[in-house]
From Swiss-Prot:
Entry annotated with the keyword Ubl conjugation: no
Signal peptide interval: 1-20
GO MF: serine-type endopeptidase activity
Subcellular localization, as worded in the UniProt entry: Secreted
Major place of residence: secreted
Keywords: Glycoprotein, Hydrolase, Protease, Secreted, Serine protease, Signal, Virulence, Zymogen
Purpose: Secreted subtilisin-like serine protease with keratinolytic activity that contributes to pathogenicity.
Domain Peptidase S8 as annotated: residue spans: 135-412
Domain Inhibitor I9: 36-120
Pfam families linked: Inhibitor_I9, Peptidase_S8
Protein name: Subtilisin-like protease 6
Encoding gene (name): SUB6
Propeptide: 21-127
EC number: 3.4.21.-
């Protein structure tokens, strides 16, 4: 979910508490999915207890189906399970009010959150030089002054690093990827293609040969958004879980260790405790995450996963080092990166120019991959490295917001 279309920000508040398990409600503007919920276990719940809980759930649902009258609509029940890093266990599915009441009273349950729609967020060594760059953001990242047209970078260019792009998919056959992009997993439909274009644009900025910051990085498409650039929060979390397992060596991915992996999430929706907790589990596993701050011109604390402190939250800057008028801001923003009128790849072999914090975040993801390729330590601490390297450049960044603009340390 990039920030092309407007993501709806909402704050989750406790609706009720039954035996300690909170049922959260979405704010007044949330695009909730009827009868769909995410159920999060208490942190101390073990794998064995989680399995026992889901068995209890299935038995409870079966009893309800047997008692149900023919005129009542049957709910689908549990549809997905999540386990991230041993600290986040949850499941999602379709449940009626009575079942949600039963689930909330179970001792293993920490909280229950309504599922909702999430949308894209678009609106000094021997250096290699790329002259007359096709997108101004490339030149800006490698120069201490605005207005340049050359991108300076080390030839290592992120080789040996894998970037997971959690988005609308990637046109892996686009010639600018030179065979470095592949499909990972699709959680939204049966079409392994980017029918929206957002994910391909994002991936191009991360690691395109001509348009990307890390020109040697391997790219993996994790599709969680459909052709309209939208999907469910539960589906996004499922994509996050898969990417974390692959990046940690639990699957058959190209990243053999979490420290050699980066993730980009140019998407967001209302503030979600479940989404933030899943993002924290990924960070705790030693994986660097760049996340779009959002495009509502408000405090990023109202958007997820941008409001999770352990990720690297990115606001959007303009070509003259101003804050993009749409960009979110606030204390949770870690850095600014180019995000207005960014040219990158489009499915089918062409290019497109888009604006949004969705375009800013992949600059940071690409920079993260580039720095790991240079030997910098990966993981969430890489965001601190990026902030230390950044320079004060953004004019009027927003109340309580950093003025730091990313820089790759080229010395130029």
């Amino acid at each position: 979910m990039g920030f092309i279309t407007k993501a709806i920000p909402i704050v989750l508040a406790a609706l009720s508490t039954v035996n300690g398990a909170k049922i959260l409600e979405a704010g007044p503007h949330a695009e909730t999915i009827p009868n769909k919920y995410i159920v999060v276990m208490k942190r101390e719940v073990s794998d064995e207890a989680f399995s026992a809980h889901t068995t209890w759930l299935s038995q409870n649902l079966n009893r309800r189906v047997m008692r149900r009258s023919g005129s009542s609509k049957a709910m689908a029940g549990m549809q997905d399970k999540y386990s991230l890093g041993g600290i986040f266990r949850a499941y999602s599915g379709e449940f009626d009010d009575a079942m949600i009441k039963d689930i909330s009273s179970h001792d293993d349950v920490d909280y229950i959150e309504p599922d909702f729609v999430v949308r894209t967020s678009t609106n000094g060594t021997n250096l290699t030089r790329q002259d007359n760059v096709p997108s101004w953001g490339l030149a800006r990242v490698s120069s201490k002054k605005a207005g340049g047209t050359t991108y300076y970078y080390d030839s290592s260019a992120g080789k040996g690093v894998t970037a997971y792009v959690i988005d609308t998919g990637i046109d892996i056959n686009h010639e600018d990827f030179r065979g470095r992009a592949k499909w990972g997993k699709n959680f939204v439909d049966d079409m392994d293609e980017d029918c929206n274009g957002h994910g391909t644009h994002v991936a191009g900025t991360v690691g395109g040969t001509k348009y990307g910051l890390a020109k040697g990085v391997s790219l993996v498409a994790v599709k969680v958004l459909d052709c309209e650039g939208s999907g469910s929060n539960s589906g996004v979390i499922k994509g996050m879980e898969w990417a974390m397992r692959e990046a940690s060596g639990g699957g058959n991915g190209t990243a053999k260790a979490a420290g050699k992996a980066v993730m980009n999430m140019s998407l967001g929706g209302t503030r979600s405790q479940a989404s933030n907790q899943a993002a924290k589990a990924i960070s705790d596993a030693g994986i660097f995450m760049a996340v779009a701050a959002g495009n509502e011109n408000m405090d990023a604390q109202h958007s997820s996963p941008a409001s999770e402190p352990s990720v690297c939250t990115v606001a959007a800057s303009t070509e003259d080092d101003g804050k993009a008028d749409f960009s979110n801001y606030g204390q949770l923003v870690d850095v600014y990166a180019p995000g207005k009128d960014i040219t990158s790849l489009k499915p089918g072999g062409s290019t497109d120019t888009l604006s949004g914090t969705s375009m800013a975040s992949p600059h940071v993801c690409g920079l993260g991959a580039y720095l790991i390729g240079l030997g910098k330590q990966g993981g969430p601490g890489l965001c601190d490295t990026i902030k230390e390297m950044a320079h004060d450049a953004i004019q009027r960044p927003g109340e309580g917001t950093t003025s730091k603009l990313i820089y790759n340390g080229s010395g130029k």
